Amino acid sequence: MSDEYQSVKQELKALLADRKELEDKLDKLQQEIYDKESEYFDVDGGSKSYHNILRGFDGMSRTQSNNSNMTNNDRIFSLSSASYVKQVQDQ
């Protein structure tokens, strides 16, 4: 095999390794965003109410708690990533 072929082959291996590393970093970042969203919407943590920037704060001063559960549609940051949505659908 020629030296040029070996050089291109090594370059391709390096690029594929870089791609894998970037994909892993992206997966970790997307999981971190998902976790932060979950933490933000955590109804059991601290306040028992479900008032936030997405649902609004109407009725926040009422003594009764709002028992609405978070839906996947509330995950505007996680769902904004096409690769994350595809990853979830593939599972």
UniProtKB/Swiss-Prot annotation:
Keyword tags: Chromatin regulator, Coiled coil, DNA damage, DNA repair, Nucleus, Transcription, Transcription regulation
UniProt key word Metal-binding: no
Recorded coiled-coil stretches: 1-43
Gene Ontology biological process terms in this record: chromatin organization; DNA repair
Superkingdom field: Eukaryota
Key word Nucleus present: yes
Location(s) in or outside the cell: Nucleus
Any one GO cellular component localisation term in the record: nucleus
Primary localization: nucleus
A Pfam family assignment: NuA4
Function of the molecule: Component of the NuA4 histone acetyltransferase complex which is involved in transcriptional activation of selected genes principally by acetylation of nucleosomal histone H4 and H2A. The NuA4 complex is also involved in DNA repair.
Quaternary structure, from the entry: Component of the NuA4 histone acetyltransferase complex.
Family: Belongs to the EAF6 family.
Protein name per the record: Chromatin modification-related protein EAF6
Protein source organism: Candida glabrata (strain ATCC 2001 / BCRC 20586 / JCM 3761 / NBRC 0622 / NRRL Y-65 / CBS 138)
